[in-house]
Amino acid sequence: MAYKFDPNDQTTNVLEDKVFISVETIRKNIGDLGMKTIQVMAYEGISEEKELIRAVSDVILFSTGQLVSDDSIRRSIQSLRSNGLIETKEINTGVRRFNILWLTTNGLLFVGKNFRRRPAESECEGFIREHASVHHGYLIKDVKKILEDKKIYDEISTERKENFIRIGDGKACIPDIVCKSGDESFYYEVECGTHKQRDFNEKCSKLTVLTREIIIVGQNRKIVGGILKRQVETWIDKEWEALNKKDVEVYLTTISDLKNDKWTYCYDMYTSEPRCNCPIVWEKKGGES
């Protein structure tokens, strides 16, 4: 049962069934390690469970010289959840599966009472603010990490403010990922397969103002080979004449294929069917590979 804290009461909390319990009881329930875990989570805005475990371990090692096992920290996280202070959810980006955590309303109030400070904005909150959803945010994060590991681009941005580009006629385009190599820019759209066709068409058409190479990354084969492939082909059929004049090419891929240097589907405006499993030739500006 989740606790409902009274922010004006420094000693007691109220349960949903009106049974009173002290904040001190919750402190005892979660123990010293639980207190440290929720403090690190709140202060550093960490949302991924593995990152939180590593951060708590580092903080304790630095401050006390003691080693704490990952399993012990996992148990403290479970204690925070069972006491209604955090919630968890599994995320699957197509290249990794992991748990994310966030403070409940009760958890926020508990942090405020115990540590007398407002928690930092969590990674989850940042993704909700910046992107369509938490899941979309983590997909973008993992695509960015893959591109960083390729060491091809000089700069990679996923910030909406930085990626805002005016394209004329009072319109703007905000690519999910903007990569720069020398004087060239490359744009990646990361799709969950939730856009309506009209919105998908508009986004892709805006990108053709910026580039003739449209790159779209999806979570898995089901989404890419089903929803996104159908949407890409519908858009191409509708805009073929304009796309043909611009010599547009479309690269549609799963995140795992991108990691493995492969486009799942490649479209040009000269053939009726896409090429499949096309090797990606990563090149820096000036042809340095």
Label the predicted regions.
Residues 2, 14, 19-26, 34, ...:
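Non-catalytic C-terminal interaction segments of nucleic acid-processing enzymes
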Residues 9-28, 119-127:
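Short, Lys/Arg-enriched N-terminal segment that forms or immediately precedes the first helix
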Residues 27-63:
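Short amphipathic alpha-helical interface segments
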Residues 43, 54, 63-142:
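Interdomain/boundary linker segments immediately adjacent to catalytic/signaling cores
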Residues 107, 217-224:
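Short beta-alpha junction loops
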Residues 148-199:
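Active-site metal-binding core of divalent-cation-utilizing nuclease and nuclease-like domains
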Residues 188-191, 215-219:
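Conserved beta-strand segments of the P-loop GTPase G domain that flank and frequently precede/overlap
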Residues 193-212:
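Mg2+/Mn2+-dependent nuclease catalytic core
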